């Protein structure tokens, strides 16, 4: 062959090899596509690793995670569908209280970004429990924490964070501008109630799933206030109690029935010798029971129970094991206000079981220190001070504060009963610890169980003063 023929022959062979290679690649692509189609069937998800897709459907968050493994899409998780929290079950039978959470927020806040708060409480949906709290619009160990002993200011807001976590700007959700608040879930959405404004003209702003649905104006112009713990939802309706009037005398108390954030009914209690503040409420067999604070003249706690039509009964816990603070030594109780050391008080709770009652209270008679749970088997109706169980929660040497009830519905736990739980606020700083310029709190919580529990002390544990205090 001459040189030109050699070049033509080599070129022809190269072109032929290239065409064959191209056909093989096309065949390979067709084979891979066919194999992928067979594996995924009718799925049309893109093959992106760890793609998180969140959609909002009928007031329900639907959260899917698609994980790509070897060209196969695997769906992880399940739809978080809406339910209606019935509240028709009875309280679970319990023998004691198991530690549930401890957020250590003040200890963490000495070095981290943690909100200055008070009045924390817990509420659960059918999917999760959350901690709600009233922030002061300031962080611990910062100059704006100065003066946060004040209860009512325009900087306070209701916020929430995952249960057991220290409340910070990074994990917390804004709920409402408020210096008094409540919140609860009906199975379809969160209802929040935030009260803010001047003492003589405060307004409660109701939100459902974050949208303002109604407002309630102070009707006595004497510091409208609400529970500082969860409201109660039964069969799609939610219930809360508000107070307006003196803290040291007869005031006005109203029960509100709320559906999807709209007030559908309200009544004023006819309770001339009673005083209701900061009620801790829970559902039990379709009715609502609230145990409250008498800041006027009772060292035992007043209660009100009502059905979904707001037909109600009222009374005081009769036990000689007194639940308020300050209070006298245990002795002879009364089904009316026990007026010895009856002035002032602290938010608290109890759980009624027939004629018996679990009473949560500070260990100290005078100071908000320590905390204990006492089972009085006849204390709802009898006036003696005999009890059969006492469980220590916080030692008398450590600070406590407000306490309140919350429940876990069968839709969350899978039980056939409503689980009773409670939280305790552990207040630090002013007015009792005057080496600081601030007031804040951490919290612990417990749930009722019918098994072994521990007697111990779970105190706040922060070492004061902080750097900002020096």
From Swiss-Prot:
Intravirion-side segments: 1-6
Domain-level remarks: Intact N-terminus is essential for virion morphogenesis. Possesses two apical sorting signals, one in the ectodomain, which is likely to be a glycan, and the other in the transmembrane domain. The transmembrane domain also plays a role in lipid raft association.
Protein name according to UniProt: Neuraminidase
One BP term from GO: viral budding from plasma membrane
Described purpose of this protein according to its UniProt entry: Catalyzes the removal of terminal sialic acid residues from viral and cellular glycoconjugates. Cleaves off the terminal sialic acids on the glycosylated HA during virus budding to facilitate virus release. Additionally helps virus spread through the circulation by further removing sialic acids from the cell surface. These cleavages prevent self-aggregation and ensure the efficient spread of the progeny virus from cell to cell. Otherwise, infection would be limited to one round of replication.
Residue positions binding Ca(2+): 294, 298, 324
Regulation: Inhibited by the neuraminidase inhibitors zanamivir (Relenza) and oseltamivir (Tamiflu). These drugs interfere with the release of progeny virus from infected cells and are effective against all influenza strains. Resistance to neuraminidase inhibitors is quite rare.
Positions contributing to substrate binding: 118, 152, 277-278, 293, 368
Major place of residence: virion
Record has Transmembrane as a keyword: yes
Catalyses which reaction(s): Hydrolysis of alpha-(2->3)-, alpha-(2->6)-, alpha-(2->8)- glycosidic linkages of terminal sialic acid residues in oligosaccharides, glycoproteins, glycolipids, colominic acid and synthetic substrates
Region (Hypervariable stalk region) location: 36-90
Entry GO MF terms: exo-alpha-sialidase activity; metal ion binding
Location in the cell: Virion membrane; Host apical cell membrane
Xref: InterPro entries: Glyco_hydro_34, Sialidase_Influenza_A/B, Sialidase_sf
Stretches the record annotates as Involved in apical transport and lipid raft association: 11-33
UniProt miscellaneous comment: The influenza A genome consist of 8 RNA segments. Genetic variation of hemagglutinin and/or neuraminidase genes results in the emergence of new influenza strains. The mechanism of variation can be the result of point mutations or the result of genetic reassortment between segments of two different strains.
Residues spanning the membrane: 7-27
Membrane topology according to the record: Single-pass type II membrane protein
Residue positions the entry lists as glycosylated: 44, 58, 63, 70, 88, 146, 235, 386, 434, 455
């Amino acid at each position: 062959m001459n040189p030109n023929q050699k070049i033509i022959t080599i070129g022809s062979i190269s072109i032929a090899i290239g065409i064959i290679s191209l056909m093989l690649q096309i065949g390979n692509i067709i084979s891979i596509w066919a194999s992928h189609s067979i594996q995924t069937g009718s799925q049309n998800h893109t093959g992106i690793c760890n793609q998180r897709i969140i959609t909002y459907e009928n007031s329900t968050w639907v959260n899917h995670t698609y994980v790509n493994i070897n060209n196969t899409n695997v769906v992880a998780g399940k739809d978080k569908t809406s339910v209606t929290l019935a509240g028709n079950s009875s309280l679970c039978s319990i023998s004691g209280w198991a530690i549930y959470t401890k957020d250590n927020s003040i200890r963490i806040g000495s070095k981290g970004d943690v909100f200055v708060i008070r009045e924390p409480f817990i509420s659960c949906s059918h999917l999760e429990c959350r901690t709600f709290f009233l922030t002061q619009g300031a962080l611990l160990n910062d100059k704006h924490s100065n003066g946060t002993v004040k209860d009512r200011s325009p900087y306070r807001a209701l916020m929430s964070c995952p249960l057991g976590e220290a409340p910070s700007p990074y994990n917390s959700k804004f709920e409402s501008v408020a210096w008094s608040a409540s919140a609860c879930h009906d199975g379809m959405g969160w209802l929040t109630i935030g009260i803010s404004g001047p003492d003589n003209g405060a307004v409660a702003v109701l939100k459902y799933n974050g949208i303002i649905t109604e407002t309630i104006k102070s009707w006595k112009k004497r510091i409208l206030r609400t529970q500082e713990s969860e409201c109660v939802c039964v069969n799609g309706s939610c219930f809360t109690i508000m107070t307006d009037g003196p803290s040291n005398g007869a005031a006005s108390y109203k029960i509100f029935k709320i559906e999807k954030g709209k007030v559908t009914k309200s009544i004023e209690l006819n309770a001339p010798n009673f005083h209701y503040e900061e009620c801790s409420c829970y559902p039990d067999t379709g009715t609502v029971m609230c145990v409250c604070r008498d800041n006027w003249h009772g060292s035992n706690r007043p209660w009100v129970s009502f059905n979904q039509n707001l037909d109600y009964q009222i009374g005081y816990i009769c036990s000689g094991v007194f639940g308020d603070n300050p209070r006298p030594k245990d002795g002879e109780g009364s089904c009316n206000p026990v007026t010895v050391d009856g002035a002032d008080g602290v938010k608290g709770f109890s759980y009624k079981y027939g004629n018996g009652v679990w009473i949560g209270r500070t260990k100290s008679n005078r100071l908000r220190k320590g905390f204990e749970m006492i089972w009085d088997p006849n204390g709802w109706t009898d006036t003696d001070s005999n009890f059969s169980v006492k469980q220590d929660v916080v030692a008398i040497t450590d600070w406590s504060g407000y306490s309140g009830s919350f429940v876990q519905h069968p839709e969350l736990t899978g039980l056939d009963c409503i689980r009773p739980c409670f939280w305790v606020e552990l207040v630090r700083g002013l007015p009792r610890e005057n080496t600081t310029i601030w007031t804040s709190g951490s919290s612990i919580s417990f749930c009722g169980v019918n098994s072994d529990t521990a007697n111990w002390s779970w105190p706040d544990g922060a070492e004061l003063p902080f750097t900002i205090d020096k």
